[in-house]
Amino acid sequence: MATAPSVSYSMTVRLEVPAGGTAVSQLTTAVESSGGSVTGLDVTASGHEKLRIDVTMATTSTEHADEIVEKLRGIEGVVLGKVSDRTFLMHLGGKIEMASKHPIRNRDDLSMVYTPGVARVCMAIAENPEDARRLTIKRNSVAVVTDGSAVLGLGNIGPKAALPVMEGKAALFKRFAGIDAWPICLDTQDSDAIVEIVKAIAPGFAGINLEDISAPRCFEIEARLREALDIPVFHDDQHGTAIVVLAALTNALRVVGKGIGDVRVVMSGAGAAGTAILKLLTAAGVKHAVVADIHGVVHAGRKDLVSADPESALRWIADNTNPEGMTGTLKEAVRGADVFIGVSAPNVLGGEDVAAMADDAIVFALANPDPEVDPAIARQTAAVVATGRSDFPNQINNVLVFPGVFRGLLDAQSRTVNTDMMLAAARALADVVAGDELNANYIIPSVFNDKVAGAVAGAVREAAKAAGAAVTAATTA
């Protein structure tokens, strides 16, 4: 699949060029003929003989950007100035900050914000610990916790290298749900240590978002923290993905006119996301599911599963899917299937595999940046196609879920998060797409749809109340 220029590799190059002639058009031609895309051309200084121009361009990689810069340098009469990577510029000094809600202008302000007045508030909380939600930032705070062991598609890069992702997550919490999220990058990958650290910092937060922790450790860590804490613990890589997939599948099935209990679903990938998707789809009514991993189709009799830990995710998959006892490869399993969901690796299927699926097939190829099957090829025979990419229709993106889910949990002062709340979130997200809007290229709303976070939050809040997990109907921050 050809890589298109992306704003992720956006560069601004400052150049001095002759004022007359064709120098400016030569700049544009040099970028476009090299496979880049000019997104901005700004004159920052002008004289009778010279122009200073900032050329902003999207490229496909840092190497591609370097090639284009060298081509610009070679144009006669052009003097190359500063070259800026716009993504790195956005990260200089970090992307988030702490800000005070009240100005501190004089002694009166100081004595109320800090000592001695703050002591009265401390004692009020000491007498009634529940007042911490009312009188501190706790009620609107979420810890975004990682050990850096499974960051995006980058792998085990450690806590410092994971920090830019956690900052970005915190920024999205604020942008879409008004939540104060705090990046917590732990310099340990010991499960016991992670559990103890999160338990120790939990008093300052109303929720815990686990992020980019490798499987199978993530399952144990989440389960232990849910058992130990009286605030919701949500591993977004699992459940955020699962909720968006269920919402998108709900609408895709509406497009093709099939029922969730009637379709055969084949999934590629049995890791954290795949397991969570499978469990939520099962709770939503999927009865015929088959999962394949690197060893082929998962079934109860597979040699590597006979002695597997009965509590393991893979054992759960073997015991709760594949009722027909299918064996073999992913390609064999997908023949005649109604739905394919990929959360695994690029290019595991070809166009011929999609063509061998049932009529009006649904394909969710979610591996990033390269999907399990080229979406352009899949569209030739599948009725509905979704990916994890922003440059194709129907992007499956967790940003559609985690802000609204936590907004609802925090507003309800929920002590936990459960399957019913996640099902409610998926239904609410699916319903944001109105009946007269629904079509094969629009089964899931944009992350910038203003209705999304509020709809998801409202559904989760009501589900928390119905489950008896809500303390009160809290006032939002």
Residue ranges of each PLM-predicted region?
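Adenosine-phosphate binding glycine-rich loop
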Residues: 232, 236-237, 256, 365-475
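A conserved regulatory-domain signal marking ACT and ACT-like small-molecule sensing domains
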Residues: 1-92
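Glycine/serine-rich phosphate-binding loop and adjoining beta1-alpha1 elements at the start
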Residues: 80-263
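Glycine-rich phosphate/diphosphate-binding loop of Rossmann-like nucleotide-binding domains
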Residues: 152, 159-177, 229, 235, ...
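Flexible, glycine/charged-enriched surface loops at secondary-structure junctions
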Residues: 39-44, 81-83, 184, 211, ...
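Rossmann-like adenosine-cofactor binding region
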Residues: 314-384, 389-391
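General beta-strand structural signal in soluble alpha/beta enzymes
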Residues: 80-83, 183, 209-212, 233-236, ...
